[in-house]
C-alpha cells in the first residue's frame, strides 16, 4: 500500500527547467492543480499541454491571461464544424462554452469566461527517432498560419512530448519513479 502523489509541473520548453509545480492527492484533479499554477504564467507565454488540458475552460482561462495554448484535446475537432479552412488539415473552429461549470473552477471565474472561443485545429504526422510515425490532431490559439505554420505547430507539440520522455528518464535515473517515504512531508523532502 504505497502513498500516491499527483503532480502538475510547469516546464520551460527552452531549458527543460521546472518553473513551478503543484502537488495534491489523487482526489484532486490535474486541472485543479493546474489552476494553482496560472499565476506563474505571463502575457505572451505559450502553454503546451496534453489532452487533459485541451479543454474549453483551460484555454479560456489562459486566453484571459494573454497566454496561448497548444495541445491535444478530448473535444471533437470534426472538420465539418470548421468555420474557416486555412490549408490542408488546418482550420479554425468555434468552441462554445459548456452548459455546466467545471467542478474545479469557482463560479465567479466560470461566469467571467467568454461564450465561445476560436481555436485552430492542425492535423498531421509527427516523427520521433526510435518511435513510429504518429498522426496527431492538436488545437491551438495561435491562429495565424503565416506566423505559425502548421508544420511548426506540430513540431512544437512533439518537443513537449520529448521533454516528457526526458522527465521519465530522469525519474528512473534518480530512482524517483518509486518514492520510499510514506508521509507527505518526507515525500516533499525526498523530491527536493
Q: Which residues are covered by each model-predicted region?
A:
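Single, function-defining residue in the core of a domain
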Residues: 2-192
